[in-house]
Amino acid sequence: VTAVIFPVKLKPQICRDNSSVTLLVKKLSLPVMGIQTINPFNNVVVKSFDEMTPAVIEAAIARAEQTFETWKNTSFKEKAALLHRVAHIMRVKSTQLSKLITLEMGKLYAQSKGEIALSADIVDYYADNGERFLADEKLNPEFGEAYIKKSPIGVLLGVEPWNFPFYQVARFAAPNIMIGNVVLVKHASNVPQCAQAIEDIFKEAGAPEGLYTNLFISGAHVSGYIEDDRIKGVSLTGSELAGASLASAAGKSLKKSVLELGGSDAFIVLEDADIDQAVDWAVIGRMNNTGQCCVAAKRFIVVDAVADEFLAKFTAKLTGLKVGDPMDSETQLGPLSSEGAAVQLADQVKRSVDAGAKVVLGGKRIDRPGAFIEATILTDILPGMAAYHEELFGPVASFYRVANEAEAIILANDSPFGLGGSVFTSDKKRGQNVADQIDTGMVFINHPTWTQPDLPFGGTKRSGYGRELSGLGIEEFVNKKLIRFSQYADPF
């Protein structure tokens, strides 16, 4: 869905006299916007929405702050029960929620169903394991007794993307609600119906008012709220530019931030790999969600001994993908999320080709309504080209031929991003050796980078910092307080 933003007249608002007045005046200096969403399959207008006014958001923050005072003392049993109800509702409403995802951002319906299932699994995972992850940690100091108490910190803000509108929220909201924090979510402006559906699910599950709140505002207004002292931590999944802006705003009030800023994952194929298996995974790793995944396999680095075979089979597989309506079960390649996304990706391909890259397959927009672009393979890519340094967010694969394993590792690391990567080999120890040398947050052997509730997710370099999912993800926004007992009047 494309977000078409247009000004809406705002009546003057009177703010209560407290520490947030200056910030609220700053926020009021920007016009409130209206947002019109467009189905990327056919570029037809779906619905129009009004952005929340600053006064409404001010009330939401105040309500969240008040809710935190009771929620932080709620038992793990009660918090887990709420999350289990949320997961159950997601599963019961899977069909309608999946259709909503597909309508708003163009994901294949079958993949939308998978996203809802994974989101529910994440919520259940933290309901089942949160208490264990947050248990007191006993220490053994030289004198006395001590332990670490893990406590919630307050109101959190999550800035979430459109490409996985339920999954991204689940991995932010579920662990933090289980901790005892409360969450505000500023979702991408092109998935407003998904955003509203998530808030409605929490309400239906019996969440207290203020525990989970959707902030329907444009990205231009976010930084002022990040600086609000009542918000104690911020998480963002988005672009490098958005991450830098958020980190700067959070730094002004010295609050914790977690950033996941995309990637350009290397997919290394060594000469001893099962090529047919590698090709099958390459298609899935590159084309899942029409290539719009932060951890999608984007750079295919293949040793010379098997490069021709891999490229021929990979090309054949992509050539046969059926393009069409994402609601059609036979469709294998749907539209990008918006016309703007398709224009940007086509421009990246053109700039790369103009600089000398070769097109093995595709390379153009598809002549039909909607945000479609052909499945594309580029070769002969050199430093300085768009395809070399930029993240290609769509069905475009960059293919590199290298002499050996050592060259593959060097090329894999020659990227500003460091989110994920994968290596294909029949030798487990060799795969581990390569994985150890790749500078990323995640490496998978004989599988493209993937996600599941019990594995940590996050990157290095310009892919951001911090971790989500697993036991590591639940500890990002906690106060780890040292508590020490002493039986000595004076140990010295």
Label each PLM-derived region with a short phrase.
Residues 23-144:
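N-terminal Rossmann-like NAD(P)+-binding subdomain of aldehyde/semialdehyde dehydrogenases
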